[in-house]
């Protein structure tokens, strides 16, 4: 049986000098699946699974980073995730990896319990959420991204048809840079309230009637959808910049309709 010599010192290859003198902007681990709990707007804790990307900047004279420390960081941070804890986690990563710059990103399914508009039956609806943070030269920026499924109904189709109008499921994606803590539910509400109609996981027949008529009374082009959501984001002081996308999965075409608005309020000030 092999026994390690107690006097033997295991070499740290990653910390040796690299003679090529080429810095690496981002190096780390990608697509790490790890259990995660997140705090909801109501103060409850929701269990989910996060897919993590963690990386740091590597100086030109350092051969490699310490990959195991990224995973160790996840193991050490099991408390329910909030924006402030995420910020602290980013700072801790830079200390652990002895790095001047770094980025953390986690994507996870987030569930909201919704009540049907007429019958009142409750059901869960899932949303894709990404929380990201980057730190460079002492400056930390935090981003919250939410993909919200909604319904859109075509104003042109309604106008030219004797009855009915084509409608479809759409995705509104809001990627917001945060100035202050902003609940996931707040971004979801903005997207759903500005769509032709929101979605529910479970609907009874009276609910289906409501959804159909609500969308018909509130038609919107993809251009209308992004502009209306953009107005809401412009008015929210918790958001300093955003990239906003809308994609309509057209029911009468084999392609999507798409629109994007990008704005940094700091440049407009």
UniProtKB/Swiss-Prot annotation:
Protein name: GTP cyclohydrolase FolE2 1
Gene3D superfamilies hit by this protein: Urate Oxidase (3.10.270.10)
Site residues, May be catalytically important: 154
A GO BP entry: tetrahydrofolate biosynthetic process
Listed EC numbers: 3.5.4.16
Organism: Burkholderia cenocepacia (strain HI2424)
A molecular function (GO) term: GTP cyclohydrolase I activity
Keyword field contains Hydrolase: yes
Pathway: Cofactor biosynthesis; 7,8-dihydroneopterin triphosphate biosynthesis; 7,8-dihydroneopterin triphosphate from GTP: step 1/1
Listed PANTHER family: GTP CYCLOHYDROLASE MPTA
Protein's UniProt keywords contain Acyltransferase: no
Main function: Converts GTP to 7,8-dihydroneopterin triphosphate.
Keyword list, A-Z: Hydrolase
Main enzyme class: hydrolase
